[in-house]
Amino acid sequence: MVELFILMMERVGLIILLAFLLVNVPYFKRVLLSREKMSSKVQLILIFGLFAIISNFTGIEIAKNQIVPNNLLTYLSSNASIANTRTLVIGVSGLVGGPIVGSTVGLIAGFHRVIQGGGHSFFYVPASLIVGLIAGFLGSRMAKQTVFPSAGFSAIVGACMEMIQMIFIFFFSGDLS
């Protein structure tokens, strides 16, 4: 469990580093400041959709309660699951871009996860869509106030989005043991 935690923190750190670099790129700053425009929404969908796919590929495969060493997850066996930062990316995309961006990134991430395989993976599509929509509606409320979400608010939203994902896993994943 400690090993999985450390590996997941590495993945979260990578996402934070990429986000930090993007926020400091002037072009991306302009996209964020004009996030209500459709052209900006499309760009945010492409950027966060790519991040979500990267999160799926760099996830940690778990089979038979063991971490399976992999560098890039292109396929999962039917008895394996994956620990990744996909839900974090979907939540952030919704907070930043609103419900259109969040739900579209959720669909991209969910369908990509289904393509990866693994047991009973189809529930990731509606789960990711719901996460994107909820985070998006919360993000759009913040945008109307012309503020970006604080770190604390984002952390709480992220935890809630992960809980939604876990509820879907609990009810729809079946027995993976």
Predicted stretch roles:
Residues M1, M8-M9, M38, M142, ...:
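Detector for methionine-enriched segments
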Residues V2-G91, V101-G102, G106-S177:
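Hydrophobic transmembrane alpha-helices
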